């Protein structure tokens, strides 16, 4: 039977995600971000709620991406997630994209010319951001055209790069309805961004989310819930450069701006430059919020939930993969658990995120 991997945030889970799961084949394994997501913000509902949403709509196994994989630029995010899924035995990767390209050929190009392509990236001017350099690489070596703001398209290329040489078949699915960051409400499939923005509109949420009641009754958070804590962290840390990816320039810009702002987005606007994109700044703010320092990734894989098919698959890979089903006195990943503790501070109704929690089971 085909074992299909899906890399996701489900922030929150909506009809477009269900469409993706419906079009995936065989056993469907989801590698999902935990309580903080790739663009550098807290997930609107916790990882357990999002895992349950996925399992109730076709996923067979949901595992958690460690913090240092989940909150990273596209290439590191894709590489870490593909590594997790590869160890779980996937032979196909299904993902949504704004533009269905021949990703398999693109992966082959990278497999053949990776050294030359990475050397090209290194040779580009330092005033370009890493995403800009990566785009120029794909334009030159694979003839990819970049038009508009298409994060899923960019992630698709990162997945192709991460899967190069691994024998994983790439299965892109055309994104349905609204674009990734679209705020449009008059569409057949609403974006996660739009659902976060219009979360109080119950009719809208009911229309575009298969688990709308679970979502609406679960504790929710946003950057606003952590703003004061973030400001405290910036003001009281004597050496911000001890935090992952914070250099002297970023530290100086943060210290100068933090007393002049009243929201996280204002801080992002003041600190971001051509070289430091807003997404990168948000990720850096997330690192500061949780006190992240450079750390190695866990070798084991944390399971959030499974169906009966998923449970059988877990048993089949258990001898070759270290699986963590319950986090107790022995930690799974200290940084991820530290981030979860901070996440819980955002809403007093949030449940314990690790200790005593067992995988969700669905029939």
UniProtKB/Swiss-Prot annotation:
Keywords, ordered alphabetically: ATP-binding, Cytoplasm, Ligase, Nucleotide-binding, RNA-binding, tRNA processing, tRNA-binding
EC number: 6.3.4.-
The reaction(s) this protein catalyses: cytidine(34) in elongator tRNA(Met) + acetate + ATP = N(4)-acetylcytidine(34) in elongator tRNA(Met) + AMP + diphosphate
SUPFAM superfamilies the UniProt entry points to: Nucleotidylyl transferase (SSF52374)
Gene3D superfamilies, per database record: HUPs
Enzyme class: ligase
Major localisation: cytoplasm
GO molecular function: ATP binding; ligase activity, forming carbon-nitrogen bonds; tRNA binding
GO biological process, one term: tRNA modification
Subcellular locations according to the entry: Cytoplasm
Nucleotide-binding in keyword set: yes
Binding residue positions for ATP: 7-20, 96, 152, 175
GO cellular component, one term: cytoplasm
InterPro entries, alphabetized: Rossmann-like_a/b/a_fold, tRNA(Met)_cyd_acetate_ligase
Record family assignment: Belongs to the TmcAL family.
PANTHER family: TRNA(MET) CYTIDINE ACETATE LIGASE (PTHR37825:SF1)
Protein name: tRNA(Met) cytidine acetate ligase
Gene: tmcAL
């Amino acid at each position: 039977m085909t074992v299909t991997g899906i890399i996701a945030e489900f922030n929150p889970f909506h009809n477009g995600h269900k469409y993706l799961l419906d079009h995936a084949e065989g056993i469907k394994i989801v590698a999902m971000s935990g309580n903080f997501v790739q663009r550098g913000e807290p997930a609107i509902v916790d990882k357990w709620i999002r895992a349950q949403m996925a399992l109730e709509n076709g996923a067979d196994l949901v595992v958690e991406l460690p913090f240092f994989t989940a909150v990273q630029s596209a290439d590191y995010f894709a590489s870490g997630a593909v590594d997790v899924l590869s160890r779980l035995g996937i032979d196909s990767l299904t993902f949504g994209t704004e533009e269905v390209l021949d990703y398999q050929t693109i992966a082959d190009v990278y497999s053949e010319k990776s050294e030359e392509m990475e050397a090209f990236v290194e040779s580009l001017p330092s005033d370009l951001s890493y995403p800009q350099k990566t785009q120029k690489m794909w334009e030159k070596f694979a003839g990819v055209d970049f038009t508009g703001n298409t994060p899923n398209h960019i992630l698709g290329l990162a997945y192709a790069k991460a899967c190069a040489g691994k024998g994983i078949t790439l299965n892109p699915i055309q994104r349905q309805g609204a674009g990734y960051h679209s705020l449009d409400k008059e569409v057949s499939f609403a974006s996660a961004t739009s659902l976060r923005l219009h979360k109080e509109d119950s009719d809208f949420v009911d229309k575009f989310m298969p688990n709308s009641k679970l979502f609406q009754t679960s504790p929710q958070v946003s950057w606003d819930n952590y703003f004061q804590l973030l400001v405290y962290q910036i003001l009281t840390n004597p050496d911000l450069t001890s935090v992952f990816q914070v250099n002297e320039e970023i530290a100086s810009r943060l210290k100068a701006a933090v007393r002049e702002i009243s929201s996280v987005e204002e801080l992002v606007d003041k600190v971001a430059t051509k070289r430091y994109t807003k997404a990168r700044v948000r990720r850096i703010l997330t690192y500061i919020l949780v006190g992240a320092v450079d750390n190695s990734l866990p070798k084991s894989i944390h399971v959030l939930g499974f169906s009966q098919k998923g449970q059988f698959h877990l048993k089949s890979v258990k001898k070759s993969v270290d699986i963590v089903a319950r986090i107790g006195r022995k930690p799974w990943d200290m940084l991820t658990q530290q981030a979860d503790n901070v996440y819980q501070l955002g809403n007093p109704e949030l449940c314990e995120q690790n200790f005593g929690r067992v995988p969700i089971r669905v029939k």
